[in-house]
Amino acid sequence: MFITSKEMRRIELNSRWLGFEEDFMMENAGAGVARVVIGEYSPNDVLVVCGTGGNGGDGFVTARHLDSEGVDVDVLLVGRREAIKNEAAELNLRRLDRAGIPVQEVRDSEDLESVDFERDVVVDALLGFGIRGRLREPVRSAVLRINEASRAGTRVVSIDIPTGLDPDSGETPDVAVEADLVVSIHRHKRGVRKLRDVFLRRVNAGIPEIAERICGPGDLITSDIWRRDPWSHKGQHGRVLIIGGSRKYVGAPQLAARGALRAGVDLVFLLTVDAVPKNDPNVIYRAVPAERLEPEHLDEVDLEGVDTVVVGPGLGADADSVGILRELAESFDGMIIVDADGLRGISGVNVDDRFVLTPHAGEFRREFGEELGRSLEDRSEAVRRVSEELGCTILLKGRVDVIGSPDGEIRWNVTGTPAMTVGGTGDVLAGVVAGVAARCREGFEAACIGAFVVGSAGCLAERRLSQGLTAEDVAEYVPKVLRNPWAAEPEAVTEVRRD
């Protein structure tokens, strides 16, 4: 299995959230690399060439384990010690010092002239999967020296990715290490698929399988929604339209609007009936004098001026949800989040990957005729079948939220609390998913992030307010999760294991 650098970073961060610290993963990775080096080459002497980041930390651990097996090891640190900001790498450098393993520091390219690179094996631990582009000095010169040694007969082993190779595209913008063997940590990175005459091995860093399947801080931190141009202007960070509300349900669309705003979008429009109070100054209202919303009411809004539309909160069972969704499917190019009564119209619409459906178990059963089993695996399989069949994203709400992608990938959200059974939290979720989708423009990613953020916000609200929280409280805690994604615990992770 080959994965992107973004996906690998997501998995690492989610592992840390589960309690598997970076030092633990680094120790396992480096020990695994050392075993591969010994098993493949049985070297007498090895030079481990390390950078100042996490890949260098893997190299420090590799050197220590090679030394413990009786291999003559030297470590070359390409960069200044004080430039190491990764705590686990810094810790493992100190361990090398205490183990008496020599570490030579290279501050500029001239320092490389005295280094003997012609060993039995050189381990490339300069740069990992998070770095791309042209190499800077003295790293570039170190790569050239490694390649000279390779041509002279030295075996070269790269940790995770050959330094200089783009981890995703496999392109080489400048120069790259000419490795004989690449030892991938956890999963092979996509970029190595383009390598020829290079052996691939994979070692386990101790990352649990569940870290790949859950939604967590890694989903949020690796998302593009964090990026804001200092010169950006109003509307550039997302514009959301909420379509909902009726004379019977006046609060639901307001809560969805609040969720979108708290997710960080710039502008939120609300198309609703005039019975809904226009009492939020942050929302731009488009109210029509009608009992319920109809497709022709879409003329009241500029669909070209929004990125994402939410259909359903408070819409009412008698609204023409089929007509509204059909019109949107034909005339709107952005993401469409369908919740609550909006789901009643799904059967009459050609759904595609622009759609994110957010049913609870009863709505899922009603709309898709799928009986949901009691186990998480049964529910996951049902979501997978429907999301693949429709070609859209489905977020099935529950104790553990199940998110299915158009191509059948399944993720689980394990945040949340029973206190969130209070009315309106689903409306907040629809708004948050829309807010995220307006910025990342990808339905599955938005659903994963939205579920994690809202569940975490509910946990924080309960921690502060106990059982008496409201949907508004949950919305108010959304920015706190965006600021600190680590604040909530993976409350329902034991439910996953139990199933």
UniProtKB/Swiss-Prot annotation:
Residues 217-499 are annotated as: ADP-dependent (S)-NAD(P)H-hydrate dehydratase. It comes from the Archaea. (6S)-NADPHX 1 binds at residue 160. (6S)-NADPHX 2 binds at residues 314, 427. Its cofactor is K(+). Binds 1 potassium ion per subunit. Keywords: ATP-binding, Isomerase, Lyase, Metal-binding, Multifunctional enzyme, NAD, NADP, Nucleotide-binding, Potassium. Residues 54-58, 128-134 are annotated as: NADPHX 1. K(+) binds at residues 55, 124, 163. GO terms for biological process: metabolite repair; nicotinamide nucleotide metabolic process. InterPro entries: Carbohydrate_kinase_pred_CS, CARKD, Nnr, Ribokinase-like, YjeF_N_dom, YjeF_N_dom_sf. ADP binds at residues 397-401, 417-426. The keyword Glycoprotein does not apply. Residues 1-217 are annotated as: NAD(P)H-hydrate epimerase. HAMAP family: NADHX_dehydratase, NADHX_epimerase. This is Bifunctional NAD(P)H-hydrate repair enzyme Nnr. The lineage of its organism: Archaea, Methanobacteriati, Methanobacteriota, Methanomada group, Methanopyri. The gene is nnr.
